[in-house]
Design a protein with these regions (language model features):
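A generic structural micro-environment signature
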Residues: 7, 52, 374, 382, ...
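Membrane-embedded alpha-helical bundles that constitute the cytochrome b-like, heme-associated redox core
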Residues: 463-495, 502-750
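Positively charged n-region of N-terminal signal peptides that target proteins for export
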Residues: 1-4
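Intrinsic-disorder/low-complexity coil detector
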Residues: 15, 24-27, 31, 683, ...
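Bacterial N-terminal signal peptides
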Residues: 6-16
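Generic low-polarity alpha-helical segments
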Residues: 14, 20, 74-79, 114-117, ...
Length: 750
């Protein structure tokens, strides 16, 4: 059985990769040249730059390329020739020493060319399997940056049909890469910037130009193609505002989030956490720790369980120059360098320091084999102590390396490839808008520290790591982030916490709640002592008209709905009464109802002059206020009659002051801040003007606490009538009990 599986895998690995260049009928025939410009008859003798430079401006291309040494060493042949190899043999040459037409398979780079360095690319005829070279000694220029860095595998096949052991594999009917399935090649996004076929860019520094119609001719472009490749993002082809009707506040989401936050949320390829080229495995490759691979002893990557990658969300400047939250995978890369000139020690020399005869040298085994089983594997490969690092450094010095040292870099690989179908896109709002948000994940930076040195953070201004890199319990490093630091200054509903407004609001609420509890308890105790005392005679008077009651109950129900949905938005994931999007929709609807009701009530009170009930009169105000305060502090406990209001007033001085603050300060404050929160989600310009929700949301939050406090106090004071339900009934029926010796309120409704 195992032999059969091996045969199948061998056939797969031998299958052709994604479609490559065919015979080019247009490209002129040419003579292969060596570095001196002389004709040669074999591929080994040929110099690509000299050969191609006979027609193309090789100097210009070398000065305008993203693939220059030492970062990469891509040649013309690797990128433009089928199979990354030009078939130069004597029998392929004509009498003039020129390559025959049928051997010229030169053209636009295809995905297979990119795969020779960057990652795993397979065509429709080859189920996905990881080749042996994936963990072998690194070839020159081969970085596996797509697969190791992003967990991306560029293939049109369904993931369920692969040979890999994927978690939840039976449900993975989507292709590995939807663009590969739709025959979209790498150059669709990464094209030459000065290509005349592209009209979506501009040259020069004129800021007011969105496109420059002045283009090179095709002939000029073929001589001087710019090899600084474009980084086209999703918005270059897709209009996200037309494809996310279900998403609330689409404009705000698209302004601050990269498309890949939801559409590349769980790549299924093996993504590296750490590439340690200071140590060498028995297979001759660097020691690699994977972030999403559960690997047992003896497992290969084809038999180990691969989980969906949970990326780190950070702020990153995208190709359009806008800083957005984007998913990245942090990879710590360690290597040996020479302190003398700062140059990297070639991995071949590092391998010689570790290996002898295709296996670990006996001296290395003797020094690093902690369990004395005769081999080095697992944690034994780690140079995580000064003694281990010095042992290998001494062997490197013996091989001629001057002053070797361990250096680490932290690379942030943006997840921009391996995009799957929309059914695998993240649709759970709680993934970000909750206490356990992906925005504040603790992220492992390094499992251990080779040579004891931490990796250097990413260079450049494109990536912003928010948080603190701190030691982990396992001896490595983790990126720790709190709710306010991740990422940047974004305020995320349901996740971000307004510490100072919560503290102030809760303390005020707690003080009022404690006060009414104590006050109510004393009232109850004193009422029991005088339970034999009858209530004084009273008459029913029609005090509250129909519209006043309708206005009051509409306001009350709207306020309750706003408090409940506000708590749901603020504490998403804790209450689980409804989804975040539903809570936001209901909250906004009741906010509109409350505002409309408030303006209609204002018109009513102005038109009927009932507004006078809310305006305190200076004459006798302090005396009346003191009388009502004395009653609440003492008289209510002994059954004394409620103090009379001033003639023509429905509200006592304490109520007038409270409603004056409520209707003229707190109510407008909540309307303005709530409207700004809504506007920030609709219009990006508003977000920029008010710094997002960073300041507006805490103020709105404090207002909500004060509204909740007023609600508790208001409900309690309802119970302070002749009976606990007397005031409540009056707001339902309109009739209120008035002591017989108490004159009828002049403002009573008829």
């Amino acid at each position: 059985m195992s032999r059969a599986i091996a045969v199948v895998i061998a056939v797969v690995l031998a299958s052709p990769v994604a479609a490559q260049q065919g015979v080019n009928p247009i490209h002129p025939v040419f003579a292969p040249l060596d570095a001196a410009g002389k004709k040669v008859r074999t591929a080994q003798e040929m110099n690509p730059e000299k050969t191609c430079g006979a027609c193309h401006d090789a100097a210009y291309i070398a000065a305008h390329t993203d693939h220059k040494a030492p970062r990469s060493a891509a040649t013309c042949i690797q990128c433009h020739v089928s199979g990354a190899r030009l078939d130069v043999r004597p029998e392929r040459l004509d009498a003039e020493g020129k390559l025959r037409r049928d051997a010229i398979r030169i053209g636009t780079p295809r995905a297979a060319n990119c795969a020779t360095c960057h990652g795993l690319v397979l065509d429709v005829g080859a189920p996905v399997v990881l080749p042996d070279s994936f963990e072998a000694a690194p070839a020159v220029g081969r970085t596996w940056s797509l697969t190791r860095g992003e967990g991306a595998i560029i293939a049109p096949q369904r993931m369920v049909d692969s040979f890999l052991d994927l978690e939840g594999k039976e449900s993975l009917a989507a292709p590995w890469d939807v663009h590969a399935a739709k025959l979209v090649d790498c150059v669709a996004c990464h094209y030459a910037r000065n290509s005349p076929a592209r009209t979506d860019g501009k040259q020069g520094s004129l800021r007011y130009l969105t496109a420059d119609p002045r283009r090179q001719t095709q002939a000029e472009f073929l001589v001087r193609p710019d090899h600084r490749l474009a980084e086209q993002d999703c918005r270059g082809c897709h209009d996200p505002l037309k494809a996310h009707a279900f998403l609330p506040y689409r404009e705000r989401h698209m302004e601050v989030l990269s498309c890949t936050v939801c559409h590349a949320s769980g790549p299924m390829g093996p993504a590296a956490e750490m590439v340690d080229a200071t140590s060498v495995t028995a297979a001759g490759g660097p020691s690699v720790t994977y972030r999403n691979v559960d690997r047992r002893d003896g497992d290969t990557l084809n038999t180990a369980t691969i989980r969906p990658l949970r990326p780190l969300l950070i702020e990153r400047v995208e190709s359009d120059g806008v800083r957005r939250v984007a998913p990245v995978n942090l990879v710590s890369r360690y290597r040996w360098v020479s302190r003398t000139d700062g140059a990297d020690v070639p991995f071949e020399i590092v391998a010689r320091a570790w290996l002898e005869g295709g296996a670990h040298a006996p001296e290395v085994v003797n020094a690093l084999d902690a369990d004395r089983n005769g081999r080095i594997d697992g944690a034994e490969l780690r140079l995580d102590t000064p003694q281990k690092a010095e042992f290998i450094a001494a062997r490197l010095r013996a091989l001629g390396v001057e002053d070797p040292a361990v250096v680490g870099n932290l690379d942030a690989h943006p997840l921009a490839h391996g995009i799957s179908t929309r059914d695998r896109a993240l649709r759970d709002c709680n993934a970000c808008h909750s206490e356990d948000s992906r925005l504040s994940d603790e992220y492992v930076v390094a499992s251990y520290l080779p040579g004891g040195s931490p990796p250097r953070p990413p260079d450049g201004a494109r990536v912003a790591l928010a948080g603190t890199i701190a030691p982990s319990a396992a001896g490595g490093l983790v990126l720790q982030r709190d709710r306010e630091a991740a990422p940047g200054i974004l305020h995320v509903l349901g996740h971000s916490r307004q510490a100072w407004t919560n503290r102030i609001g809760f303390l005020v609420f707690l003080a009022v709640l404690l006060g009414v509890t104590v006050h109510g308890g004393l009232r109850y105790a004193m009422r029991r002592k005088r339970s034999h005392v009858a209530h004084p005679a009273a008459e029913k008077e029609y005090v509250f008209g129909r519209y006043e009651r309708l206005w009051h109950w509409t306001m009350a129900l709207s306020g309750i709905a706003l408090i409940v949905t506000g708590l749901e938005v603020h504490g998403t994931g804790k209450w689980a009464l409804m989804s975040l999007s539903t809570s936001v929709a209901i909250h906004n609807a009741f906010a509109v109802i409350l505002i409309v009701n408030g303006f209609l009530a204002l018109f009513y009170h102005l038109a009927t002059a009932a507004i006078r009930n809310f305006i305190p009169h200076p004459r006798g105000f302090l005396a009346s206020a003191l009388e009502h305060m004395t009653y609440q502090a003492r008289g209510i406990f002994y059954g004394e009659s409620h103090p009379r209001n001033a003639a023509g007033q429905k509200l006592n001085p304490l109520q007038q002051v409270t409603y004056l603050a409520l209707l003229n300060v707190l109510f407008p404050l909540q309307i303005v801040t709530g409207a700004l929160i809504w506007a920030v989600g609709k219009w990006p310009a508003v977000a920029s003007a008010v710094a997002g929700l960073h300041y507006v949301a805490p103020i709105h939050n404090l207002g909500a606490w004060l509204f909740l406090t007023f609600f508790v106090l208001h409900v309690y004071l309802v119970s302070t009538g002749r009976t606990p339900t007397d005031h409540l009934k009056s707001m339902i029926t309109g009739y209120q009990h008035v002591d017989a010796d108490e004159p009828e309120p002049e403002g009573a409704a008829r």
